[in-house]
C-alpha cells in the first residue's frame, strides 16, 4: 500500500480530512493508526477500501494498493466500519458471514468451514447460524462485522476501532482473532484504535495522523518499546487516560435520591402479544433494583448482549417496563418534564441529532463547544462529523438540556486522551452540582475517573446487583419490528419449511384463477381455503386478521365505491339523486372487494412463511435472475427492517429531547412530519453505509458462489399441487354456480 501526497477533502468542509499524506506499508506489515478524533483515520481506511465518494470531493495525489487504484482492487481489502449496524448485510448470522466468501466465488464446500472458523475466532460460536442479526446487541454486531471480514481472508485488513463497543474479555478475544488471521494468511493489517495498549506490542509500527496533516510513524526498538510521544493526541498506554486528570472526589455526603428502581423487568419491546405469539416477550432482565442520589455515578457493566442498553432506555422512561417500579416514573412525564429529569445519550449518536448545525444542537453554548473541542465544526452538519466528534456532541446535547440525571450509552467510545479528559471533567462538574450519571460502559478508566458504583449485569434473568459477579454472555433476545411480508425468523411450520419456488408457483396459479373472473364464488372459495390451511402455516386466524386489516378495510372501500359509482342494474336499493345503489352494483362491489382481498390473503400467508434469504437463493439459482439484483433487493429488505427500528428509536430520541407530540392535531402532524424527515435522512445515510459494506466485501456483478443450494423437493411439489387444486376448486365452484365470467 502506498500514499503519494494524498489529499481528500469532504465537499461540505473547508479543510481536508487528510492532507498531503505520504506513506509506504509493506506486504504483511502490521500497522497501528492513531491520532486525535477527527484527524482523518477513518477517511484513510475508506480510501484504501476504494469506497470514498468521488463526487464533489477534492482529491489530489495518489493512493495505491498493489500498484493500482483501490477501486480496482475491491475484494482485496476487507473494511470494518465504525458503525456495526451498517456492517451487517443479511438477516441471519450464518448468511451474513457467508456473504463475502460467496461474492469472491469461494467453492461451496469450503464456505461452511470458513463461517465456523470465523465465528469461533471472535467468540460467536454459541450463536446458531439461523440466529437473526436484528436480535444482536451493538457489541455482538461489531463482532459479526469482523467475522464477515475474516471469512473473506483478504490480503489487506482495514479495521476501524474493532474493539470500541466490546467488553474487556471480548476485546482481547477479537484482538487475538485479528492477529491470528493476519499471521495465518500473511495479510497486511491496518488498525485504527485509540486504546493502543491492547495492540502496540504486536504491531510493527505506529502511524500517527495529526489534524489531517502528513502521517508520522514510530517504530519500536529491540525491547518492544515505542519511541512515539505517549502524550501525543490519540496515543494510549494503559494508565495514560487517568494520568492526565486532576485529583477529584465526588460530593460527600451524596444528595437526595433522584431515581429509585425496584424489581424492574425490561425488554426492548412492549409487554404485548405479537401476530405470531400468544405470549408477550419474556423480559431480558428482571428483578433489577437501583437507587441513585445526587452527586453519584453508576456504571452499568457486563458482557455484550445481556440487555444493558435496554435497561438504560427503560430507566429513561423511553421503553415501557415489563414490571417493577420507578420513582419518579418518567413514563408519566410529558416531554418537557422529561427533559429536565433525564438527558439521554443513545448507543448510536446520530439518532438524537435534530438540528442543522453543531452549534444549534448545543443551543449555541460557546462553553460547551470549546470544552468538547467542537468549535472548529460549529457550523458543520452534525452528520458529517467523525465518529468521536459525534459522540462528544451527543453528550453535549444531554448536558445542554440541564437534566438532573445523565443516562449515557458508551459515552467515551472513539475518544482520544484529550477528549476523554474533557468529557470526564464535564461529567465531574455535573456531579459537583448535584446531578447524577448512569452510564453503560466497558471503559474501566471512566469508572475510575468518576469513582462510579458498579451495577454488574451478567445474565438475562438473575437479579442485577451492585456487586461484581462472574460474566456469562447471553444474547439479548429482543425481536425486531417485522415487515408486512417477511419475518427475520424462519418459520418452523410445515409451510415454512417448504421451498420458495413451490410456494411462488402455487401463488401464481391461485392468482391467475382470481384474475380470470370477477365473481363472489371463486373469491370466497380461495378465502375459505386459505383460512383452512392456516394451521399448516402456523398462523392464528385472529393474529392474521390483525396483520391484514388494512387490506380488509381497502376491500370494504372497494365495495362501497363500486356500489355507489357502478352502473345501475337490477332493482334500485337507494336513490341519492346524483347516483343510485342497485342490486347489480352492490354485487359487483362485493365481487371486486372480495376478489382483491382473496388475492392479498394467500400472498401474505406465503410471504409470512418464506425466508427472504431462501427466496433470494431460489430466484438466483433456480429462476436465474441476476445475483446483483436479487442480493441488492435482499439488502434493501433488511434496510426496511432497520428503518422500522430507527423509526421507534427516533421517536424515543425526540421524546428525550423534549420534542414529543403535542395534544393538538397541528402539533402532532408537525411532529410526525419532522420525524419522517429524520427517518429519510437516516435511510439515506444507512443505505450509503450498507452499500459501502457490500462493496468492501466484494459485491459486484462478477461470478459468485452460493453457500446453500436451492432445491425442489417432493414436498414442494405437494405445495404446487395444493395451489393448483385450490385454483381449480375456485374456478369449478364459480362455473357450477353460474357466476364465472372470463374478464379477458
Language model segments and positions:
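The feature captures the beta-strand-to-loop junction immediately N-terminal to the Walker
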Residues: 34-36, 301-303
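Helix-to-loop junction immediately C-terminal to a conserved catalytic motif
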Residues: 49, 316
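Conserved ABC ATPase "signature" region
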Residues: 110-127, 365-377
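Conserved ABC ATPase signature
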Residues: 132-136, 140, 381-385, 389
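Hydrophobic anchor residue at the start of the ABC signature
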Residues: 146-147, 395
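ABC ATPase C-loop
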Residues: 149-150, 398-399
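Catalytic Walker B motif of ABC-type/P-loop ATPase nucleotide-binding domains
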Residues: 157-161, 406-410
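Transmembrane alpha-helix interface motif
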Residues: 475-522, 526-535, 645-744
